[in-house]
Amino acid sequence: MKITLLGTGGPRPDPKRMGPSTLVRVGFDNLVFDAGRGVAARLVQAGVPITDYAYVFLTHLHFDHAGGLADLLFAAWNMARNKTIHVYGPKGTEAMVRYLFEAYERDIWYRLSETVLTHEKLVDIRNMVEVHDVGAGLVVEGDDWRVTAADVDHGHGLGLSRDEWTCLAYRVESKGKTVVISGDAVYSPSL
């Protein structure tokens, strides 16, 4: 298991720090946790081709943690990726990705139409991305790894319940090694 911090910045742009994102390499799989600003470029800088990841896990749906998701998905698609990308996140993730596809519907149509001239093998991105709203418990298992989620409290003293503002931490286990990744969180017994 190899961990790479792709971005550790916050919601305010900083030329020295990209938005929150962590890459966990487990065997031949690249797992991306959070998709903050600049995640696609940082993934490539880390030596991972933009077409060589299959799993994205969002801790919560603040723009600084999920704002780079469109770039991550569309950049891989535009490079003729044709394998499924799985996106996991708290309640609302499915709706967010659906809205992204609606917002870029004309662009999707344009690029698919363009393949008649370029002869590229571009599949419809809407058929390439599987999105899963998840909660606490087992999220997904790979060949030699598994990811589970726990509900955590975001904090900031806003008084929002976990039902009103769902935040997740993820636990990656592989071959006796474990790493826990959380986005914004205050002390949470589940963590």
Task: Say what each PLM segment does.
Residues M1-V180:
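Binuclear metal-dependent hydrolase catalytic cores
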Residues G176-L191:
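Active-site-proximal loop/helix segments of hydrolase catalytic cores
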